[in-house]
Amino acid sequence: MKYGFDNEKYLKIQSEHIKQRIATFGDKLYMEFGGKLFDDFHASRVLPGFEPDSKLKMLMQMKDDAEIVIVISALDIEKNKIRSDLGITYDMDVLRLRDEFMDRGLSVNSVVITHFNGQASAEAYRKRLEGMGIQVYYHHTIEGYPHNVALIDSDEGFGKNDYVETTKPLVVVTAPGPGSGKMAVCLSQLYQENKRGIKAGYAKFETFPIWNLPLNHPVNLAYEAATADLEDVNMIDPFHLDAYGETAVNYNRDVEIFPVMNALFDDIYGFSPYKSPTDMGVNMAGYCISDDEVCREASKQEIIRRYYTAICNFAEGKATEAEVAKIALLMKKAKITTDDRRSTVAAKERLEKSQSATAAIELEDGTILTAETSSLLGPSAALLLNALKYLAGIPHYVKLIPQTMIAPIQKTKVNYLHGHNPRLHTDEVLVSISIISLIDENCKLALDQLPNLKGAQVHSTVMLSEVDRKTFNKLGIGLTCDPVRKIKHLRKKEAEEE
């Protein structure tokens, strides 16, 4: 793996900068943690070398003075929004996050449900959490937000929200994903704290967009692709340009909310400590890029991956045409096409020859392998076996799983479990070679290569089952699929790992 990001430097200078910001405020600091506190796989993909739990490591250094508030939007609860990298809904991820934080000794005292307008699903979720002993608060949608500053900064605006009880000087506000309303929760709390005579401050810790990279740098374009469903747009921060004469990149929601922030600080302090949305942030990631070209290329690949995710979601009714169009436009800005993904090209070339579902993998060393569907194996399962054999130095013609073993598995799947697809999935072939490894050295060698698949890139010419998607995800393999449900076989095929 080529590294483009210095994670050790990042941990050092980022934690120092956060501590400096905390010291500038008095009684309490609300810090909005954008992105993900851990499992930040997007950052690790576009900034090779960034560790997914880097933010958590920094927070652990301040855990005695910090508590966490988790935010979830009632809108996301209502539509069962999925966290794509983990395959679980946001409402389930709130509980997962809470458990993860508490297991590390961090204090998590409450959950805030934002954008609440009486949704039955949100009310049911609140009852469920309260039944588990979790304190839950409602924050309502405010008409005209974020532009109607007079209403927002009043008892009819933030004043209608529940006051979130906190006890520590540092309050970290986080969420399962973007668009949950973290900033609004922080601002509401500043208003509520001021009413109670408490001088509270606000800061923002968000990795993307990286403010000191160019507007159309692939790293920043990849952030727009990741948030296409939120209609976020990166832009030059006009306030920063006016105050300092320097160009800085921010995104539209921060720029839109800045007048509200200024008005709130004027009420609390009599002045605003920030001259621009960029000033509110504490992001030091841009100073830790060690190889710009590596990060550019990784980000371009991420944009392509997001494009395929969007078109597959659109085919399943889970995304809008506007989301697809936006990412397509970002690809043009980055001067890339789907042909810039090598596994995609290889899979489609194999499809033209075989006229059946195919898949291709690009390994970390640049090697490309392909596979197609057969009567015994799906293309992803066959591809996985091919990759393991290659990495283990096992000749291609060697069959890791005897046909005599596959046949009874298929019989069970179809005759007894009443499945429609007799072909083995990726998890089933892994279980099979795990069993055989007790008596077969080749299977043992193949299994030992599983960790070496991390970072590989796969493309499938058909949309995969949830089982196969999760298997690739657990192995750390990047996956893209064409928005096709099934390819009819033009010729009958025998079992083959090829």
Language model features: what each stretch is:
Residues 177-178:
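The conserved Walker
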Residues 185:
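Hydrophobic positions on the alpha1 helix immediately C-terminal to the Walker A/P-loop
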Residues 201, 373-375:
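Residue-level structural signal for beta-strand termini and adjacent loop
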Residues 376-392:
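A short, polar/charged loop-to-alpha-helix boundary motif
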